[in-house]
From Swiss-Prot:
It comes from Rhizobium rhizogenes (strain K84 / ATCC BAA-868). PANTHER family: 4-AMINOBENZOATE SYNTHASE, PQQC-LIKE PROTEIN. Gene3D superfamilies: Heme oxygenase-like. GO terms for molecular function: pyrroloquinoline-quinone synthase activity. Belongs to the PqqC family. This is Pyrroloquinoline-quinone synthase.
Length: 247
């Protein structure tokens, strides 16, 4: 019977998932960060990515609802606050809607989630279901894509500033804030997984959970590319390039 890898080897195995599969390598992101997206494509990305953003606190609430460890609950609930903010201000969702406004979309239209691609919905709901139903260790492991997020946020900020007129401080506030928030979340989540994946079976399951999450992120961009880049076939119910545009 094979033994579990030591912490260093196991962490390296987790990080290798991101090196091979994280969505910073997707052609759509390379196009976006390189200034090669039209405003229709940028807006379609903002609309569809909002659906993912809006479901993250719901995913985390589902996680907390079955978490019996108060220490874990105390650490995890900050994630909901990071995305939802306070009663009147703050939070990643509000900051994403500022981006929507900056690219010329009605924030109320974006928040309605009308026009979100079916492929986006299926991928995001699969993630929420995964976190709601899978063992706690796997649910935490699926969040470890945040290990790879700071680099993509930094590249995105630089690329948007260089190539797009809308990229002001207000528009980029979401990404700048995540540069501060994500490392804190990663530190806790990674330590939790390294501490609790104490058998090879649990390590394999953790790697599979992280791989699943990279598939969730990648498949959203596949749906977006198919609809708005090539072949450019917008499916029924997908944003038509006009609705909700205010400038």
């Amino acid at each position: 019977m094979q033994q579990a890898a030591n912490r260093e080897a196991f962490e390296a195995r987790l990080r290798a998932v991101g090196e091979a599969r994280y969505h910073d390598k997707h052609p759509f992101h390379q196009q976006l960060h390189g200034g090669q997206c039209s405003m229709i494509q940028v807006r379609a990305w903002v609309i569809n990515r909002y659906y993912y953003q809006s479901r993250i606190p719901m995913k985390d609430a589902a996680f907390l609802s079955r978490c019996e460890d108060p220490q874990l609950r105390r650490a995890w609930r900050n994630r909901i606050e990071d995305h939802d903010g306070g009663v009147d201000e703050g939070g990643g969702i509000r900051r994403w809607l500022k981006l929507a406004e900056a690219v010329g979309l009605d924030p109320d239209y974006v928040a309605s989630t009308r026009g979100v691609l079916a492929g986006t919905r299926f991928a995001v709901e699969a993630y929420v279901h995964f976190v709601r139903e899978k063992p706690m260790l796997e649910a935490v492991a699926s969040s470890l894509t945040e290990m790879f997020a700071p680099a993509i946020h930094a590249n995105r900020i630089a690329g948007l500033i260089e190539h797009y007129a809308f990229a002001n401080d207000s528009a980029l506030a979401y990404f700048r804030q995540r540069l501060n928030e994500a490392p804190k979340e990663v530190a806790f989540g990674l330590n939790y997984v390294l501490d609790h994946a104490d058998t090879l079976e649990k390590q394999d399951a953790s790697v599979a959970a992280l791989t699943f999450k990279t598939d969730v992120l990648w498949s959203q961009l596949d749906a977006l590319s198919h609809a708005y880049v090539s072949p450019g076939l917008i499916p029924p119910g997908g944003w038509d390039g006009r609705e909700g545009v205010i400038s």
